Design a protein with these regions (language model features):
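Acidic/histidine metal-binding catalytic segments
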Residues: 84-91, 124-144, 152-153
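Divalent metal-dependent phosphate-bond-processing catalytic cores, especially two-metal-ion Mg2+/Mn2+ enzymes
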Residues: 4-45, 55-84, 95, 105, ...
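Catalytic Zn2+-binding segment of zinc metalloproteases
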Residues: 100-108
Length: 191
């Protein structure tokens, strides 16, 4: 039995209970998805090259940088269902904030990212099909302005990003999530 002497210790105890419960509840989904991920290659795409491209000239630090992108990728993997194109979700994770000019309000960065990826369509993204490229472009363009699209891949991209809003002090509202799995995780973030 723990002797909790202050609110901080109590808070940490609840945090770890939530973490362990969440991990236990979703290990089936994770193992199922990891199996799919191993089976689905990134075609001729080199995710490390995409990461390096995203990091090139990055000046805004970690709030919207690599640690955030890695969490978005992880969230997307957890949220993905069989109809989601995981290649698009993983690319979105590293490219959606590439064109941010500040860590505050930058509503146009999604549109700028969509324009930017057109510039790498025939180099870093040459392995994408036209459909995958269109999904990636729309996900980047709309991720700050659109609640949901009805497309499972794009909506998974949105929720993967939204589930990391706590890093900037914003708790994602379950009813503002684009997918049912995103809604579930948003409801259970505080447990």
């Amino acid at each position: 039995m723990y002797n909790l002497t202050n609110d901080t210790e109590l808070e940490h105890t609840y945090m770890f209970k939530w973490f362990h419960r969440r991990k236990d509840n979703h290990s089936k989904h994770l193992s199922e998805f990891k199996e799919r991920l191993v089976m689905q290659e990134l075609a001729s795409l080199d995710i490390e090259a995409i990461k390096q491209f995203a990091l090139k000239d990055w000046e805004l630090g970690e709030t919207h940088g690599l640690p955030h992108w890695q969490r978005v990728e992880r969230n997307g993997i957890i949220l993905a269902t069989s109809e989601v194109n995981i290649t698009v979700v993983r690319l979105f994770a590293y490219l959606h904030d590439k064109c941010r000019i500040d860590n505050g309000c930058d509503i146009e960065h999604g549109k700028k990212a969509a324009i930017m990826i057109n510039g790498i369509r025939h180099t870093l993204l040459k392995g994408l099909t036209d459909n995958e490229f269109e999904l990636l472009s729309k996900a980047c363009e709309l991720h700050t302005t659109t609640l949901r699209t009805g497309n499972s891949t794009i909506d998974t991209c949105f929720d993967a990003d939204r589930l990391d809003l706590e890093r900037v002090g914003i708790i994602p509202y379950p009813n503002k999530m684009a997918t049912s799995k995103g809604e579930y995780y948003a409801k259970n973030l505080s447990e």
